C-alpha cells in the first residue's frame, strides 16, 4: 500500500520539477514493487497529476491479449488525453512459477511481433477489421517497443515505432 502512495508522490514531484514522462513497469510476485496492475495504477496517477505524460515501461504483451491492452490504454487516453504512452515488451517480467501462474507458454514471446501489430490495429483499425477496441479506436496512443537486444530495436525500426533501451537488462 505504501508503494502505491509513493508512486503517486514520485509522479507529482517529477511533474513539479519539470519531467516530461513517468512510466511504470509491469512486474509480478516482487515485494515492494506495486505495478502489477499497471493500467490501474496509471489511472490513479493520472487523477493526481495534470501535465506529465504517464505510461507503461512496459506492459509485457505476451502476458495479455492485445485487445485488452488496447481497451485499457484507450480508456486511459479517453480520460487523460494525449498524456498516455504505451510501452510494450516481450519478457515475462517475473520468475518461472509466476510465469506459469500467468498461463504463459514458451511460444508466447515468439508471437510478439504479430501481437504488436494487432495492438496497433486496435488504435488504427484496418478497413475489414471485425473487432474494434472501444474506446481505443482512433485515439492517438503512442506505442513504444521496449527491449534490451537487437531484436526489439529491429522490430521497432521495421514498424516505425520508438524504441526504449533497457540498460539494466543488458548483461
Predicted segment positions?
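N-terminal small/glycine-rich loop or linker at the start of catalytic domains
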Residues: 1, 127-134
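Flexible, glycine-rich active-site loops centered on histidine and acidic residues
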Residues: 1, 62-124
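Active-site mouth loops of central-metabolism enzymes
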Residues: 1-4, 59-66, 141-147
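Conserved small/polar residues in nucleotide/adenosyl-binding loops
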Residues: 168-170
